[in-house]
Amino acid sequence: MNQWMELAERVLDGGEVTEKEALSILECPDDDVLLLMHAAFQIRKRYYGKKVKLNMIMNAKSGLCPENCGYCSQSSISKAPIDSYRMVDKTTLLEGAKRAHDLNIGTYCIVASGRGPSNREVDQVVDAVKEIKETYGLKICACLGLLKPGQAERLKEAGVDRYNHNINTSKTNHSNITTSHTYDDRVNTVETAKKSGMSPCSGVIVGMKETKQDVVDMAKSLKALDADSIPVNFLHAIDGTPLEGVNELNPLYCLKVLALFRFINPTKEIRISGGREVNLRSLQPLGLYAANSIFVGDYLTTAGQNETEDHKMLHDLGFEVESVEEMKASLQR
């Protein structure tokens, strides 16, 4: 038995991954990556079988953000040519939900740019979510930024199932990425969402000049935060942002990152998120041996893979899509 299978068996028996072992996953020799992914798959299979959760993003508000996040094309310091608009209307949010439902996508993610939502914007989301729940029954994830007192409770009451607010990077690396809010601001928002009864979703962006130790710290921080869902983004550097031209990733390293997050967060939903197409490239399918969830369609300001291609990929792997009906049943358990 190889070292990765031994580690997987220990994790499945309730054991922890040490700091040294976590770093060794990221430093796995390229020739051994298939062995590593096979071991990660044993953990993934225990908790999720061969099911894949599908998620779709609605970019409900674009640009116009006062924050200075170095990776983001919507930030105040970005010169990227993007569409900027205020919160879309209810009809547009409902049309997006219908499209998700028709494509058998169980989770609909309403995402808005900005530091955090105004109470009026929360009103708009609340109004739309109530009708989406009644009409389509989708799982709703909201990603609206830092929350003010009372906003999380209103979203929960309206039917929002999950709230996303990514930590993005390690606490050590945070000030290299943004200075307009703190790492603790992000953690506190996830805790606020959790206290309201919404399922906490928080993830990372890998490839922002962080060290391997930073990546290990991210995975362990999300374990401590007890995030139910962990989106793992890989930097898609956009022209006009401070991280323009940064390209530190390769497909094999991205697979190692996904394996690390599965080993450290064995029971959690690990989602391959933004940047998978440009960073994993032809190795995208292998990522699902560690992860059990993907975004389908476009991201916020970058294009994703065609939905048909995603379904073909899952079929070719012998994996099964978690249907809308299965997702509804899971919400009732």
Swiss-Prot record:
Record's keyword terms, sorted: 2Fe-2S, 4Fe-4S, Biotin biosynthesis, Iron, Iron-sulfur, Metal-binding, S-adenosyl-L-methionine, Transferase
Cofactor note: Binds 1 [4Fe-4S] cluster. The cluster is coordinated with 3 cysteines and an exchangeable S-adenosyl-L-methionine.
Keyword Cytoplasm applies: no
Quaternary structure, from the entry: Homodimer.
GO biological process, one term: biotin biosynthetic process
Cystine bridges: none
Binding positions for [4Fe-4S] cluster per the UniProt entry: C65, C69, C72
Species assigned in the record: Bacillus licheniformis (strain ATCC 14580 / DSM 13 / JCM 2505 / CCUG 7422 / NBRC 12200 / NCIMB 9375 / NCTC 10341 / NRRL NRS-1264 / Gibson 46)
Keyword ATP-binding attached: no
Protein name (database record): Biotin synthase
One Pfam family cited in the UniProt record for this chain: BATS
Signal peptide: none
